[in-house]
Amino acid sequence: MSGSICKTAFAVLAFGLSAFSGSYAEAASRFMQTGAVTSQPIGHYQFCQIHKDECSIISENSGPARVTDFGWNVIKDVNSEVNHKIMPMTDQDIFGRDEVWTYPTDVGDCEDFVLEKRRELMAKGFTVSNLLITVVRKPDGEGHAVLTVRTMDGDFILDNLDDRVRLWSETPYRFMKRQAEYNTGRWVKIENSQDVLVGAVEK
C-alpha cells in the first residue's frame, strides 16, 4: 500500500473515531450517571415520616419512559401550571424553620413545587421510577430542588424557576443527588455533573 493511500486511510479512520467519540459523548451527556447510595435530605426524611407509603415504593427498573408528543405536552403543562399557581416562599417565611417538605396549597419552597409536579404527573400515568426528586446547586452555591423526568430522549428537568422543560445538561446547575429509580426512599449520587459543566464551558 502506498504512503499516500495509508495517510488517506488513517485520516478517514481518525475522522470516524472522532465523530463516534463526539456522538457518544453527546448521547451520554443526555443522561445522568448515578453512583453509590448517599444521604437522604433531612427534609425528605421528615416528609417520609408522614407519608410512609410514598417513600417505600420498590420499582423494577423498566428503563426511561418513551414519551409521546401528547406526553410532552402534559409534562410542559404541569410544569408551567404548578409554577404559576403556587407562590414561591421560603420555609422560614412559611413555617419559621428550614427544610419542611410538604404538598403546597398556595405557597411553597422549591421542593414543594417538585412534590406537587411529581404527584400530578403520577396521577396522569407517569411511573414513579421516572419522576425523581433531585438536589442541585445553583451557580451562586445555594441549594435547590428540581424534578427529573427520565425519558428515552434524556433526563429532563422541571424547575420552579423556569417554565421551560430542559435537558439536565442544558441547565446551569451542579447536580448532586437524586432519588434512586428503584426505591423512593433511597438517594444516589450523580457522578457526571462536573463533566457536563466542563463540556458546556468548552462549547
Regions found by a protein language model. Name each.
Residues 1-10:
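Bacterial N-terminal signal peptides that target proteins for export
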Residues 10-19:
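Bacterial N-terminal signal peptides
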Residues 24-203:
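A structural boundary/capping signal
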